[in-house]
Amino acid sequence: MPNTRPLSPHLGIYRWRVNMLQSTLHRLTGLFLCLGTLLVTWGLIAAASSGAAWHLFAAFCGSWIGLVLLFLWTWSLLFHLCNGLQHLLRDMGVNFGPANRDRTHDPVYWSAGWAIVAISVVLTVLVWVLLLLQVGGGAA
């Protein structure tokens, strides 16, 4: 006999919202931070061992794939930090209570989520601009 029971809740009723994006990105950036820590560990081990190991590590980090991975790792770190601070504020009850219970339909409520994504991107670009200026000899 076929199962005729309804599926509940069905995925078709959900609308993609910024908090779903934040939750997914928070988990993915946490995973990427763990994987990126392997790259940092490789660098520490290479620095503590021979000069050849360090030159291999530096060559990898200077390649286009190394730079992309380091850029994404930086963004992951800063997004995870910003989103974690937002979680902390929500855990402390900031903007929760009877006066704010219907804010889920408020555009300002949702724009705060997009602000976290934007702030993390701006901070990442700022870090890399400062880093490239420092490496390039533009800063004293």
Residue ranges of model-derived segments:
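Membrane-embedded alpha-helical bundles that constitute the cytochrome b-like, heme-associated redox core
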Residues: M1-A140
